[in-house]
Amino acid sequence: MKCPFCGNLETQVVETRVSEDADFIRRRRQCGACEKRFTTYERPDVNFPAIVKKDGRRIEYKRGKILGSMNLALRKRPVSTEQIDSAIERIEEKLLSLGVREVPSNRLGELVMRELKKLDKVAYVRFASVYRSFEDIDEFKTLVDEVRR
């Protein structure tokens, strides 16, 4: 593997660890030329279904987009990065288990809302209010009442 510091192609693996849930492998490598160390991660290369937008456009699934949306909803909420990553993993597992080539964006949105509801009720309401395009306070009230039950 190419060294990110000097570009040398000769590096050696000095340590290998499997993640707790066995989803990826972490490797510490050392460059043979500059002797600097760096970390790489290996995870299976999977093909997620394409996301079909409301207007019919098809876009590729992007983990970063889900992460950004969830982080926005969870801003200043007491939820750890690990909890968010686990929620995204569950969303991705569900997407893959569907066994389809395309998923409507509203289905993905529902999966995100389900995970947010488990993590933090305030974040769930924040996300749902934007996702469902609330237009008046009564829609907020209905959702908050639903969450309180």
From Swiss-Prot:
GO molecular function: ATP binding; DNA binding; zinc ion binding
Keyword Aminoacyl-tRNA synthetase among UniProt keywords: no
Keywords: ATP-binding, DNA-binding, Metal-binding, Nucleotide-binding, Repressor, Transcription, Transcription regulation, Zinc, Zinc-finger
Cofactor dependency: Zn(2+)
Comment on bound cofactor: Binds 1 zinc ion.
PROSITE patterns on file: ATP_CONE (PS51161)
Zinc finger (unnamed): 3-34
ATP-cone domain mapped to chain residues: 49-139
Listed GO biological process terms: negative regulation of DNA-templated transcription
Disulfide bonds: none
HAMAP family from the UniProt entry: NrdR
Family: Belongs to the NrdR family.
Listed PANTHER family: TRANSCRIPTIONAL REPRESSOR NRDR
Function summary: Negatively regulates transcription of bacterial ribonucleotide reductase nrd genes and operons by binding to NrdR-boxes.
Protein name, entry field: Transcriptional repressor NrdR
Organismal lineage: Bacteria, Pseudomonadati, Pseudomonadota, Betaproteobacteria, Burkholderiales
Name of encoding gene: nrdR
